[in-house]
Amino acid sequence: EGGALYQLLSLVDNTGEANTGIIIKGNDYTEKDLPVGTKVIVSLKYAKYDINNDLPQLRMATIFPTQEKVTMKVPQITVSQAGDYVGQYVTVKNLTPAANSTTWVVNKKTTSVNFTDDAELPMVARTTNHAVFANEAIAIKKADLSGIMEIYKGGYQIFPNSMEDVAGFKVE
């Protein structure tokens, strides 16, 4: 919805349980076209399952939106649980950004912001210049961060996608 997931959709069964989501790549829907929480029918007739840099995904799946809307069940997780929630929208609890963090996007280029949790486990937040919060300053404090959990070359990354996702790190 905020532009950070350009041509990516997170498809979940909305139970909030582990291992119930997957990324669908190559679809160019906007929040207006396909609002978060829209129940969909997915045709796999032309779809291809793919693993790209460790991230399981579907390519060329056909999405048929319905008129039915649901309230998303968002799992609250720790960094140690990230591997069970790849492809799902989650909230990661108690993250602290690195002391040198400035804004979500630096120099108008996709940016990784490093975080750690209470156990000092790392989590990377990836943000593209398309995100509505790209130029927002990051407060150096402990808070929760929401977004789509992904994996890239063995490391877990969260893609926040709205101002609400990053609200805990707003500079007051």
Model-predicted segments: where are they?
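OB-fold nucleic-acid-binding modules
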Residues: E1-E172
